[in-house]
C-alpha cells in the first residue's frame, strides 16, 4: 500500500492518539449515564463538567452557556431554527452570506419555505463579507445575522468582531459558525460580540458526532431536540460522554 498523503483536514481530521486514550475508559469502564443520580454516574458527570469548563475557558464563556450537540451542523440548525421560532413575533428577517456552509444555507432555505425572508450578503474578491452591504441590509424586522468565522473552502477569516458590533448596534442577535476556526484562532465571545457559536470536535482531532453550541445568557431560544432534561432542558438525549471528553 502506498503511503497516504492526506490533504483534507479542512473536512475532517485524524483522532489524536491521546484523545482516543482519554475516550476509551468511558466506553467500557466509566460507561454510566451522567444524568443519573447514583454514585457511578458521578464519574461521567465529572468528565462532562471538566470538558464543559475547558470549552468555556477557550472562548471566554461561562460554563452554563456551553451545550454539547451531535455536531456542527446540528448546532447551526439549532441557532437558526430556534431563533426563528423564538423571535418570530419581533420579525422574520435573517441575514447571512452567500458563502456559508450548507448547514446554514440549507437551513435558511428551509426557513424561507416557512415564511422567513433571508438576505444573502455578497463578499469581496478575498471572500470577506462586505460590511457596508451587511449593515444596509438590516431592517426593523431583522432578528439574526449569521456569518461564519472562517470559510471551510477558501479559509477566509471574517471580521467577526465588527459584524457582531454592527448587529448589536441595531439590536440584532449574532451567530457565527466557528467550526473551521474553533481551536485554531483565538475566539473571545465577549470581545467579538458573539451571541451564539457553533463548533465541532472532528475538525480539531477529536471524534465525529460531537459538537458545541455556545448560547449567551439572555438569548431566549428553546429546545431544538425534545425529550429528556439534558443540557439544562435545552437539548435532549443521553450525553455522548466519550465524545465530550
Where are these regions (language model features)?
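Pyridoxal 5′-phosphate
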Residues: 1-245
